[in-house]
Design a protein with these regions (language model features):
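Residue-level signature of mid-helix packing/kink "hotspots" within the transmembrane helices
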Residues: 36, 64-72, 156-157, 266-274
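Structural signature of the two symmetry-related core transmembrane helices
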Residues: 85-99, 287-302
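Helix-loop boundary and gating motifs at the non-cytosolic
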Residues: 17-64, 222-229, 233-261
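Juxtamembrane intracellular "pre-TM" segments in multi-pass secondary transporters
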Residues: 2-18, 194-228
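Helix-to-loop junctions at the C-terminal end of transmembrane segments
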Residues: 70-82, 272-285
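Cytoplasmic helix-loop-helix junction between adjacent transmembrane helices
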Residues: 114-152
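Helix-loop-helix hairpin linking two adjacent transmembrane segments in secondary transporters
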Residues: 148-190
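Conserved MFS/SLC helix-loop-helix module at the cytosolic interface between two early adjacent transmembrane helices
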Residues: 68-105
Length: 349
């Protein structure tokens, strides 16, 4: 494709999206520029603190469990109190809990605060996705979710490379930088983003649409099927931040080496997400999710045969292609399955 063609494709990819979307996009980018804990927690615990890989796995599991628990409550808050208040509470709580985690030394305290960090950081997800669905036209949603995922990984590509060198100097500095950047996100939300929750009408509720509860969500067979399969794929992708750093550490590589390798994930997404999305946005999401799951399994399976930085980087490139296809497709499908009055609750998956 010519340079003019690339410019035209870029313009078409960002055209027609409302200003509120771009402020939400900016908040996401700022948040990911400060990302540190999720990327380097395993290395921090095993290399800096001297704990075992099994303990690092336990902490990662508690961090994930906190996210699962909080997403249920955050989904209800998003629908009941609004997207904006939920975002503000989640981001301020994340900033304080991440800073606190950097000062913890006792293994029980580390595990407990990691659980709180997981709760706080994941609480913003239902609100972000519901707000994005509110403010973007249905035909533009896959593109909008892809651009948001692109922002996540643009920030991640920069932060992961920088964080590797920060970790060589001070892990505590990484925790404090993430806390500060998360507070900056809260400021953007507070100053620039209005509430987007659709107004309830007299026809809602018993006289019109049935009210949406968590029980309604759990009884939705199609949605729960998507959630179950997405959970399995998410467990696989999580190995990029748990299994991969431990494998590289055991092979004698440094945190900076891991930061360089995992940085390929963000760089590839930044380069390929927009053109790939233009190719897949009108295709059957079921087929796309199947292809992405197979590609993810293949990519992570290759890690067993990696022994050099180049091969580790190659494995990251393979499963990153799966992530590029999976992320906007899965999020767009969830929004399609969710009723307007229950968007927050439906984003918990």
């Amino acid at each position: 494709m010519s340079v003019a063609g690339l410019r035209r494709a870029a313009r078409e990819s960002v055209a027609g999206l409302p200003g509120a979307f771009w402020w939400l996009w900016t908040s996401t980018l700022v948040n990911r520029l400060g990302a540190f804990v999720a990327t380097f927690m395993a290395l921090y615990l095993t290399i800096d603190r001297g704990y075992s890989a099994s303990y690092a796995g336990l902490v990662a599991a508690l961090h994930g469990l906190g996210g699962v628990v909080s997403s249920l409550g955050a989904g209800v808050m998003t629908d009941r109190f609004g997207r904006r208040p939920t975002l503000l509470v989640a981001q301020v709580s994340t900033a304080f809990s991440v800073a606190l985690l950097g000062f913890m030394r006792d293994p029980v305290a580390i595990a407990a605060v990691a659980f709180l960090v997981g709760m706080a950081s994941n609480a913003s997800r239902p609100a972000v996705q519901a707000m994005m669905a509110d403010i973007v036209r249905p035909e533009d949603r896959v593109r909008a979710f892809a651009l948001n995922f692109w922002a996540i990984n643009l920030g991640f590509a920069i932060s992961s490379m920088a964080a590797g060198f920060i970790a060589e100097y001070s892990y505590l500095a990484g925790f404090l930088i993430e806390a500060g950047m998360t507070l900056a996100c809260a400021v953007v939300v507070f100053v620039k983003l209005p509430e987007s929750r659709p107004e309830r009408t007299p026809g809602d509720g018993a006289a019109g649409h049935a009210p949406v509860s968590l029980l309604t969500v759990l009884r939705d067979g199609r949605y729960m099927g998507v959630v179950g399969l997405s959970l399995l794929v998410a467990v696989v992708f999580q190995q990029g931040y748990l299994g991969l750093p431990i494998a590289m550490g055991e092979a004698g590589f440094t945190p900076a080496d891991y930061g360089l390798v995992i940085g390929f994930n963000g760089v590839l997404i930044v380069v390929l997400q927009i053109p790939v999305t233009r190719f897949i946005e009108r295709r059957d999401p079921r087929n796309l999710l199947v292809v992405s799951a197979l590609l993810a399994g293949y990519g992570f399976g290759l890690t067993a045969f990696a022994g050099s930085l180049g091969v580790f980087a190659l494995t990251v490139c393979v499963w990153t292609l799966a992530e590029i296809v999976n992320a906007p497709t899965q999020t767009g499908l969830v929004v399609r399955l969710s009723p307007v009055e229950g968007r927050g609750r439906y984003q918990v998956g």
